[in-house]
């Protein structure tokens, strides 16, 4: 009896809250936030750029007139602080909305950072909901992006490390150069098209696809739980290591000193440019690899799946 009373009271309370909110909306008591674009011209010299934002898309673009300018959509209770101290440009979102404000639909807004120079010391961004896009015109000493919900598209290069992490969203890089490359996605896709990396590459995808087309590096390590791996036109100076729980692994014109692939469920197929001696194991699948006994070690194991590897020149006699 007591349990039934509690359930009934909860239902009535929820219904009353919905009626109250609906009355505010229909009666004009809750007006949608009106956004307008505000600009922040920067005259101080800047070497480092730091962003801490949420519910806004970020674009890093070359300045059309040689000035450093921040343009952002703002409302009465959502605005930004833009400061420069010791050569660091800091942009932060200030969210002063009430809980009632947050019940209203608020579409992601856009922020554009126009940079006059092509070279800067560092770019770091902590984003919560929103996409990040960095144009190809820039080179940083380091790039460090952490995005909770949203994608990251980076075409800029770094003399040091590029590190990008996304909880839910895709990461895309094209024609970049860096000393090191770290890309981490919990749920999403990693796509790299054209990358020259001096040292190591670390690619982690918990759930999602990994697609690389055109990469040179010293070493390549990729781990993940679920998702297909496709590597095309890859040149690894030393070790290539891939580990997956579920998902196919496909090579197209891949070269390395040594290759190691471990997957629980999935096929491992494709063409390798280098000569290898093969060590293979599959519980319920077929194995077809070149009968070679020289070159580097290529170890491929899968519990459920086929292993089919050919030399790259076999498709182009």
How should these model regions be labeled?
Residues 1-4:
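Positively charged n-region of N-terminal signal peptides that target proteins for export
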Residues 6-24:
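Hydrophobic membrane-insertion alpha-helices, especially the h-region
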Residues 20, 94-96:
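Short hydrophobic/aromatic-rich motifs at helix boundaries and adjacent loops
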Residues 26-94, 104-126, 131-146, 151-157, ...:
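Short linear S-[DN]-x-LW-Φ motif typified by the pepsin-like aspartic protease active-site region
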Residues 155-156, 162, 171-317:
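Short, surface-exposed interaction patches in beta-rich subdomains
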């Amino acid at each position: 009896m007591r349990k039934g009373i509690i359930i009934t009271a909860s239902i009535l309370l929820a219904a009353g809250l919905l009626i109250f909110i609906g009355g505010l909306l229909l009666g004009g008591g809750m007006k949608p936030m009106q956004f307008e674009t505000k600009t922040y011209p920067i005259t101080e010299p800047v070497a480092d750029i730091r962003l801490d934002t949420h519910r806004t898309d970020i674009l890093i673009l070359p300045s059309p007139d040689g000035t450093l300018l921040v343009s952002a959509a703002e409302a009465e209770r959502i605005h930004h602080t833009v400061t420069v101290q010791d050569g660091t440009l800091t942009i932060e979102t200030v969210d002063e909305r009430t809980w009632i404000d947050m019940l209203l639909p608020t579409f992601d807004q856009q922020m554009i950072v126009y940079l006059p120079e092509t070279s800067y010391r560092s770019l770091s961004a902590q984003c919560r909901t929103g996409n990040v896009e960095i144009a190809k015109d820039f080179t940083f000493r380091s790039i460090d992006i952490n995005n909770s919900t949203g994608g990251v598209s980076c075409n800029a290069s770094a003399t040091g490390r590029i590190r990008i992490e996304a909880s839910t969203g895709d990461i895309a890089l094209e024609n970049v150069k860096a000393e090191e490359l770290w890309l981490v996605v919990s749920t999403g896709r990693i796509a790299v098209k054209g990358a020259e990396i001096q040292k190591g590459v670390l690619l982690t995808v918990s759930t999602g696809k990994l697609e690389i087309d055109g990469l040179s590096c010293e070493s390549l390590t990729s781990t993940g739980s679920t998702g297909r791996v496709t590597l095309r036109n890859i040149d690894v100076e030393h070790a290539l290591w891939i580990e997956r729980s579920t998902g196919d692994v496909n090579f197209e014109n891949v070269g390395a000193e040594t290759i190691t692939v471990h997957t629980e469920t999935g096929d491992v197929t494709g063409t390798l440019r280098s000569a290898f001696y093969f060590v293979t194991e599959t519980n319920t699948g077929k194995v077809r690899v070149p009968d070679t006994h020289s070159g580097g070690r290529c170890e491929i194991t899968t519990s459920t799946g086929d292993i089919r590897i050919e030399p790259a020149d076999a498709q182009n006699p």
